[in-house]
Amino acid sequence: MPKRTDVHKIMVIGSGPIIIGQAAEFDYSGTQACLALREEGYEVVLVNSNPATIMTDTEIADKVYIEPLTVESVSRIIRQEFPDAILPTLGGQIGLNLAIALAKTGILEELGIKLLGTQLDAIDQAEDRQRFKDLMQELNEPVPDSKTVETVQEALDFAAEIGYPVIVRPAFTMGGTGGGLCDNPEQLKEIVANGLELSPATQCLIEKSIMGYKEIEFEVMRDADNNAMVVCSMENFDPVGIHTGDSIVFAPTQTLSDREYQMLRNCSLKLIRALKIEGGCNVQLALDPNSYRYYVIEVNPRVSRSSALASKATGYPIAKLAAKIAVGLTLDEIKNPVTGTTFAEFEPALDYVVAKIPRWPFDKFTRANRRLGTQMKATGEVMAIGRSAQEALQKAVRSLEIDEKDLISAKAQSATDDEVEEKLFHAQDDRLFYIAEAFRRGYTIEEVHELTKINLYYLDIVKQIVELESELSQNKEDLDVLKRAKRYGYSDYTIAKLWGTTEDEVRNLRKEHKLLPVYKMVDTCAAEFDSSTPYFYSSYDLENESKKSDKKSVLVIGSGPIRIGQGVEFDYATVHSVKAIQKLGYEAIVMNSNPETVSTDFSISDKLYFEPLTLEDVLNVIDLEQPMGVIVQFGGQTAINLAAGLEAHSVKILGTTVEDLDRAEDRELFDQTIKNLGLKQPIGKTATTQEQVIACAEEIGYPVLVRPSYVLGGRAMEIVNNEQELLDYLAQNAPAEIDHPILVDAYLSGLECEVDAICDGKDVLLPGIMEHIEHAGVHSGDSMAVYPPQSFDENIKQQIVDATEKLAVALKCVGIMNIQFIIHNNEAYVLEVNPRASRTVPFLSKITGIEMAQVATRVILGESLAEQGYQSGLYRESDMVHVKAPVFSFSKLADVDSFLGPEMKSTGEVMGSDYTFEKALYKAFTGAKMELPDNGNVLLTIEDKDKDAVLPLAKRFSKIGYRMFATEGTSQFLRENGLFVQTVDKLGKDTGNETSLHDLIVNDGVDLVINTMSHDQEVASDGFVIRQLAIEHNIALLTSLNTADALLKALENRSFATNSL
């Protein structure tokens, strides 16, 4: 069927900010789709609120709008652009829900706008729990006993009828939001109440639990001619009961017989045809491990996290083809871009095994509830490819960049047998390490299966890895055992640990005996057809398929899995670095381990190595490719941490040298540089013992800021007010050591700001200064930022520019760097310097038009700023005002305190742009889903020290017609100052007031909670409980008065003043 000619301009809806359950995979799929539509000759208009994406680059679509993803905002753009059609299935759940909401307003019908790809009715049928169940019964496909409910009572009645445990699944949500497993009525009441609140349709499905079944996924495609095919089958290591986004996953399926595979494949194809889905779709199935009985769990009628994984696992570009199907092309007329010869209807065949492991944020949230269930908690994931499941699994573990670099966990080793069994029975993020530990202690596969319900095959894989461990320990330098270990994915690091030697010695032994990895191609067809994809993985196999080219090449190290503190922004910088390398005529080679990102799309670079980002794996690629150098500035802390090891092996680090990187990161060297330049910084000390930490704090004077050296995202960083808090901090975090010193700084109050700068060794370009809206003490990644600055005069800007130029030249920065300042008493103090790309690069690049990562890469490769047409100093400021706002995923992480401080907690960001600060703020708040009514209710729970500061804010709330509620102390203070405030009872206190704080929040009596009650390290503190209640009930929450001030500016700008004469 030829492509559509009745459509010329297509609007693509993006997925908005990164949150748990909806991460970088939609940047990848959205980018692919826009490029595919343009390739077919259509004009593309893109709407997305997330500036940190490749998708929102001006060359991806004909027109790019970075605006809030709301009905009001998108309707405005539709009336401005008049697209012929909208493609909503590539923007995740956000894009789908927005398309449904737009259709309900009647605007699509009014303007004759078509929906491309899967139609609304099909989306509704797959997403509406009751309609989906009815369709399954019509098709005679089994679903677990279930009922759609709209009240808590209905849920309780149905659960009583079918018996516990039951699973709750809210409709039209993603990442298992608001869902969960319930063993009793109390849990059910709580989870259903929350689920109904979070479901746009206010409905939940209550279903009989089928925990312990195998969880199987099929990624399927269908076109308008009803051709359908399976792209990839995937099997969860964890049985049903743990969200697939929190499960280890293998592709292709490993434990299905041919009969089981065909049965589930046929079911998946039957479903996609019955739902009339056009494009990609994900089918989740549960299979009884002891019979041929299966159930359909759900269908996602859109491109999803699993489709990004399936695309990278097979090399088959699902989103690209889904976009082409949406405009009428069929699978039998689209060429497979990988082989270039076969058509897209050929099902991919894999001659390797892929393992995916989720990356959780619990290293940052040590107090979070780590139990895994039906609600997703991972922020990202890693993928590894091997010739065996053992190899893929071990490579994936070392890709995670956590404390454990293999299956040997010190924590698991020191646990008692009871603790090990508890960890096996109640799944947490670290269960895999405890399974390995159980086998070390002599537990049988059957005993571990009884506790975990994990398939015997997968347990056997772990057991084989553990058995080889003891063989390695007993046969030091035995080449046969070494060969087997390398085929099982063992790293030199682990082998060295078991042999009691060094990693370099193992490496030298391997090289001496020619035991080297080869690189295999990912070609979608198991080598059945000729293929020339530049997409490789390593294995200790026979034939090497990756040939070094004659061109000079540069290796760019990616940033690994998405986690808090190191998000999609670094992938953005990596992709732009690759573009610059290619424009200068070099071959660009990328190494990365993240299946969700644009950088691991093999069409982006000249060669892609999908490998763990460890020293051994990077050196192996360098041995083969012999690049002229390696760029580490764009891969976040992951890449920077590899620099010293690479240099020690005589690898050329391009750009800022390792010695100069070290000078910026090493406290004493840095302090010396600051002193030599005559710049100011807060008083700071370095301590290597606990006693020293306490002595330093005494000497500087409380409050102090304490943090470990060499971290990203403010991990383990805290403001402490007295010695007791300092002792608590040291007990919670690793003690100070010679190798890992702790930094103690004076805590200065004032306005924070940051700059990104590009330096060629002589000239220094500052694309812009970003002022933080929250005062010092809130991590820069969690702070709202505004460009150009609103509170700085020319004198302060000049101080910042002078300090930046001096530092960049003195630190011999070649490439990009980020500096954070605090403005205290009208003077700029240097807080920290990061000699690499920071998370603000995409934001600043978009608003200034300077492709910062590309400019920096050209500098790194020897082209000066002057040769690129830039001069030293601050780039001209834009006429518009741009605000970057953080977005959090607290609703997915129980027990994480939402009080903002120096430890970063946000998962994503949005941007608001307009001609006034207030309007830009309003758009940023709206984009971050903080949509407040013109006159609503606000609850103020304020620390004593903040009462004076809250008074002017309370007066402004009163002026725009907000009703105020507060507990006794705050209420009395505000009433004494002439304001009308309703007093509410404190938590757990009944003092005869009309309502209590608890009931006010639980019964949705307020629209906004402002809570500055400090996090006194007590999980049960009132402040913490209030914040948790607000998050559970989906109520806007602010913990900083600066943010409240900004929100008021936005609200005041929207409402009319009413003053008497």
UniProtKB/Swiss-Prot annotation:
ATP-grasp domain ranges (all copies): 133-327, 671-861
Q: Which InterPro entries match?
A: ATP-grasp, ATP_grasp_subdomain_1, CarbamoylP_synth_lsu, CarbamoylP_synth_lsu_oligo, CarbamoylP_synth_lsu_oligo_sf, CbamoylP_synth_lsu-like_ATP-bd, CbamoylP_synth_lsu_CPSase_dom, MGS-like_dom
- Residue ranges, annotated region (Carboxyphosphate synthetic domain): 1-401
Oligomerization domain: annotated segments: 402-546
Provide the residue positions that the database annotates as binding Mg(2+) 4: 832, 834
What PANTHER family does the database record attribute to this sequence?
A: CARBAMOYL-PHOSPHATE SYNTHASE [AMMONIA], MITOCHONDRIAL, CARBAMOYLTRANSFERASE FAMILY MEMBER
Q: Where is the MGS-like domain?
A: 930-1061
Q: List positions binding Mn(2+) 1.
A: 284, 298
Q: Which residues bind Mg(2+) 1?
A: 284, 298
Q: Which reaction does it catalyse?
A: hydrogencarbonate + L-glutamine + 2 ATP + H2O = carbamoyl phosphate + L-glutamate + 2 ADP + phosphate + 2 H(+)
Q: Where is this region: Allosteric domain?
A: 930-1061
Please name the taxonomic classification of the source: Bacteria, Bacillati, Bacillota, Bacilli, Lactobacillales
Q: Belongs to which family?
A: Belongs to the CarB family.
Sequence positions that bind ATP 1 = 129, 169, 175-176, 208, 210, 215, 241-243, 284, 298
What does this protein's UniProt record list under function?
Large subunit of the glutamine-dependent carbamoyl phosphate synthetase (CPSase). CPSase catalyzes the formation of carbamoyl phosphate from the ammonia moiety of glutamine, carbonate, and phosphate donated by ATP, constituting the first step of 2 biosynthetic pathways, one leading to arginine and/or urea and the other to pyrimidine nucleotides.
According to the record, the residues making up region (Carbamoyl phosphate synthetic domain) are 547-929
Q: Where does Mn(2+) 4 bind?
A: 832, 834
Q: Which UniProt keywords apply?
A: Amino-acid biosynthesis, Arginine biosynthesis, ATP-binding, Ligase, Magnesium, Manganese, Metal-binding, Nucleotide-binding, Pyrimidine biosynthesis, Repeat
Q: What is this protein called?
A: Carbamoyl phosphate synthase large chain
Protein's organism:
Ligilactobacillus salivarius (strain UCC118)
Judged by the first EC level, this protein's enzyme class is ligase
SUPFAM superfamilies reported for this sequence: Carbamoyl phosphate synthetase, large subunit connection domain, Glutathione synthetase ATP-binding domain-like, Methylglyoxal synthase-like, PreATP-grasp domain
Q: Where does Mn(2+) 2 bind?
A: 298, 300
Q: Which residues of this UniProt protein bind Mg(2+) 3?
A: 820, 832
Gene, per the UniProt record:
carB
